[in-house]
């Protein structure tokens, strides 16, 4: 089986959680199937492609990067995105398309129509719940919202990373068939989250902020952005 993962972000060009998600998903899938990641920000060098975990992977991992067409270098940000999406849609060659974020959703939807390939979308955020983006994109926000809505409403499956996200998806896009929206929680690689030894220098953070390391600690990890809901 061949899977094309479409993503705005992919190593080494990662600035948010969606990029981390796409990287980790691609590595795990590549243990089992042939994966091609189609991402923004231009070609990747061979040494920038993540290694497939495991001793005997049955699949493969390939990364194809795309640049904004030179004719659109000075265009609105949404139009730059669409310029990359058109290139990706033309190149898709897979049994399943898996798109992430609105940046790549239009490419997935166009490829679905062009090639007849089933489209899966993972929701990391939703344009209707980020109205402040109009400050950044102007009328381009209407374009990004349109692209996301059309892609979601025509996807064969939409993955929500939580029950709350599923509710938001159905609220934002009431025309979407609820049976197509499923919850798949984010996972972690447990070996990367082992409790450090007592002499690990990382414990100095607890000392610096006077945190009792013997008590449970609630930690938030995320970008400082309005959509995260932190009022400080």
What are these regions (language model features)?
Residues 164, 187:
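Carbohydrate-associated surface elements
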Residues 55-92, 135-136:
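A short, charged, and often flexible helix/loop element on the N-terminal side
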Residues 117-120, 128-150, 167:
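Nucleotide-sugar donor phosphate/pyrophosphate-binding loop at the beta->alpha transition
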Residues 97-98, 153-163:
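A short beta-strand/loop micro-motif in the catalytic core of glycosyltransferases
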Residues 99-104, 123:
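Short His-centered aromatic/hydrophobic patch
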Residues 1-53:
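N-terminal subdomain of nucleotide-sugar transferases
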Residues 194-211:
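A short helix/loop element that forms part of the nucleotide-sugar donor recognition site in Leloir-type
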Residues 4, 212-228:
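Conserved donor-binding/catalytic core segment of Leloir-type glycosyltransferases
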